[in-house]
Amino acid sequence: MRKLALSDEILLSIEKPARYIGGEVNAVMKDPDKVDIRFCMCFPDVYEIGMSHLGIQILYDMFNRREDVWCERVYSPWPDLDAILRREKIPLFSLESQSPVRDFDFLGITIQYEMCYTNILQILDLAGIPLHGAERGETDPVVIGGGPCTYNPEPLAEFFDLFYIGEGEVVYGALFDAYKENRRQSGSREDFLKRAARIPGIYVPSLYHASYHEDGTLADFHPLCPEAPERVEKQLVMDFDGAPYPEAPVVPYLKATQDRVVLEIQRGCIRGCRFCQAG
């Protein structure tokens, strides 16, 4: 039986403790000693909002179908628990195993809207992960950004090790295989980032130089090494009939913001307006 990261005293003192205990219907449990990669999936908002998001459910199910990967979840804590974690020096933890987020191989953060940017910094700070990618060492998780806001990644570039540009079902398998191969060859963190940069749709900010005009607009942008492509192409799912989809989605114990069945009948928009991420 797993041990909860929070004591009964703390759980009884905070609002909606079910946000933090995990153990929901269809939550995936694995033996950490029998997987090669531990991935912590983060929706940087409160549990009720994150559990309403279908994209997280799709990737969670897809990753956990691999025997060599265990994907867990973490969400932004409410201010009451945020204060307790800081006061008691309890590191932010995943729901499934209640393990510290900083102990994972990857921390994947979906960036759905700009208003969650400060929550991303909160997640990193509470987890004890250095805020800036350049400050992270060999034992820190690789921090990945995904979701619609990665179409303009530069405002957050210094906080992420890499960005996945496009739809998540396409090249994560190649990224995991590259990580395993880099580990097998005793490669460094930098070696892995260079391997990752060769994968279509993966943008590694540290492998590029960006300069700006006085008004903040981009003046120059170019790769710093041969592994980084001149242009990162977004990844698209071309066959939705063959795309993974959760057969047993995680069912929360408390009421989610969208307290109903979620079905995807269409993705994106055919109009292609230049100001819109969906198009």
Predicted regions, residues:
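Helix-enriched interaction subdomains in cytosolic or periplasmic regions
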Residues: M1-K16, R66
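Conserved mixed alpha/beta core segments that line enzyme active sites in large multi-domain catalysts
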Residues: C116, I123-D125, H132-R136, P244-Q258, ...
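Glycine-rich beta-alpha loop elements in corrinoid/cobalamin-binding modules
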Residues: S76-P223
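Low-complexity, highly charged intrinsically disordered N-terminal segments
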Residues: F39, P44, G50-D61, D68-L85, ...
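Conserved, mostly hydrophobic/aromatic
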Residues: F63, L107, D161, C269, ...
